[in-house]
């Protein structure tokens, strides 16, 4: 099968891109041809198909909204890429004409490519399968968060809540544009052109089906790990570990609050420590002279793996509806118990008392209780083994591939 893989970044910047390259490798290893469509960036992985890529909004060095210089041209591009871009539609149709794919597998496109990629593919008679990593189809700011708490007002009261609260980037303009784009996409039924929606979690699947999306078109196919490293014998480490993005919704503040009261315990926090949230937390730790919390910064490769191996357990303290984070599966790979917030998809990963513990989101006292339950090496070893078994039974590459190919084959067969 020849598959056109669409994502607005062609370099690793987070979980969706890790998945993109992992699935690309997996499909190619199974004999499929995978061809990318994306946006030009100086960070992109080299590919002969970059000649089809579209220009970014703010230059090839800009990645995030805040880095884009606001000019009349860039503002116009922001609008079209949020609502509908004829430029992008033309580009993907040109690539489809040349490479003649059997199917489009769409990952991330919102605000950078626009749903014109869906229309472009359908106008060329190519079926589209869309994988969802967040809640952009339901929430204007993608994460159901407002002021450090879960908010679903847009589902119950309508999108005026988003505009009133300036939910998107704290900006009235950005909030209005996002709400308008969502209403416009609904008006033109652009997502009717998607043959199937792939969700990593049952939680996201249920959210979609409860809010107007056809249940028979939604398929829960959990992601997988694809590390080539030999894990070796499990280790019972000496410290707790958080690794991942250090942003408000990830709940790292709860970890800091807990370990401030657990002076005999140690925690390491690994991830980009230049974010606004990381800087704030590091300042707090310094001001309060907390010695048992260590920020490691961003790590990768063998260094990252060694730090995970050396952990006693890992922490996923999210305060948002986290959607099957890769950090959980990476923890399972190294036979680590996981202490996670009881929110979103996390109970699908952590069975309380079996391969870790669940605690009340943002509740440092409850987290402290769960940390102390892992003082016993026997419990740590038993739960770590359960994590590994859970990974192999539910989140293996083989399981993911089989389920995904079933959807792909049906999409191509039933394409009209």
Segments from the language model and where they lie:
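Acidic donor-binding loop of glycosyltransferase active sites
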Residues: 309-323, 336
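N-terminal subdomain of nucleotide-sugar transferases
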Residues: 1-50, 99, 124-127, 257-260
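A conserved mid-protein helix/loop that constitutes part of the nucleotide-sugar donor-binding site
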Residues: 18, 238, 245-261, 365
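Nucleotide-activated donor-binding/catalytic signature segment of Leloir-type glycosyltransferases, i.e.
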Residues: 279-302
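A conserved catalytic-core segment of Leloir-type glycosyltransferases
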Residues: 30-32, 36-99, 103
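A short, well-ordered alpha-helix in the C-terminal region of glycosyltransferases
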Residues: 366, 379-394, 400-406
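Donor nucleotide-sugar binding/catalytic pocket of nucleotide-sugar-dependent glycosyltransferases
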Residues: 137, 156-230
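Conserved acidic donor-binding segment of nucleotide-sugar-dependent glycosyltransferases
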Residues: 352-353, 357-364, 371-378
């Amino acid at each position: 099968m020849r598959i056109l893989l669409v994502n607005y970044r062609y370099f690793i910047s987070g979980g969706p891109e890790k998945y993109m390259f992992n699935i690309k490798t997996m499909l190619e290893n199974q004999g499929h041809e995978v061809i990318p469509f994306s946006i030009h960036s100086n960070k992109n992985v080299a590919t002969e198909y970059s000649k089809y890529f579209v220009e970014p909004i703010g230059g090839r060095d800009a990645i995030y909204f805040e880095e884009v210089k606001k000019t009349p041209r860039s503002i116009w591009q922001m609008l079209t890429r949020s609502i509908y871009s004829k430029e992008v539609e033309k580009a993907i149709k040109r690539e489809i004409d040349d490479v003649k794919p059997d199917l489009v597998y769409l990952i991330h496109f919102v605000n950078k490519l626009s749903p014109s990629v869906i229309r472009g593919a359908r106008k060329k008679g190519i079926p589209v399968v869309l994988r969802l990593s967040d809640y952009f189809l339901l929430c204007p700011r993608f994460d159901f968060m407002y002021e450090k708490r879960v908010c679903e007002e847009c589902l119950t009261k309508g999108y005026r809540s988003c505009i009133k609260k300036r939910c998107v980037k704290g900006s009235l303009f950005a909030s209005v544009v996002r709400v308008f784009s969502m209403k416009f996409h609904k008006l033109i039924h652009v997502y009717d052109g998607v043959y199937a929606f792939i969700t990593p979690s049952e939680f996201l699947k249920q959210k979609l089906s409860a809010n107007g999306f056809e249940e028979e078109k939604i398929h829960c196919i959990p992601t997988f790990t694809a590390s080539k490293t030999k894990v070796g014998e499990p280790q019972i480490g000496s410290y707790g570990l958080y690794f991942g993005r250090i942003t408000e919704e990830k709940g790292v503040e709860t970890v800091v609050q807990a370990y401030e009261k657990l002076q005999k315990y140690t925690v390491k926090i690994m991830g980009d420590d230049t974010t606004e949230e990381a800087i704030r937390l590091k300042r707090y730790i310094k001001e309060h002279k907390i010695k048992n919390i260590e920020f490691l910064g961003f790590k990768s490769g063998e260094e990252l793996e060694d730090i995970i191996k050396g952990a006693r357990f890992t922490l996923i303290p999210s305060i948002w509806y986290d959607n099957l984070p890769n950090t959980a599966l990476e923890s399972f790979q190294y036979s680590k118990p996981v202490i996670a917030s009881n929110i979103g998809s996390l109970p699908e990963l952590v069975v309380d008392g079996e391969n870790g513990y669940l605690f009340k989101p943002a509740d440092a006292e409850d987290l402290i209780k769960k940390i102390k339950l892992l003082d016993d090496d026997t419990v740590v070893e038993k739960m770590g083994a359960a994590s590994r078994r859970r990974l192999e039974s539910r989140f293996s590459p083989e399981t993911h591939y089989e389920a995904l190919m079933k959807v792909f084959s049906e999409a191509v067969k039933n394409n009209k």
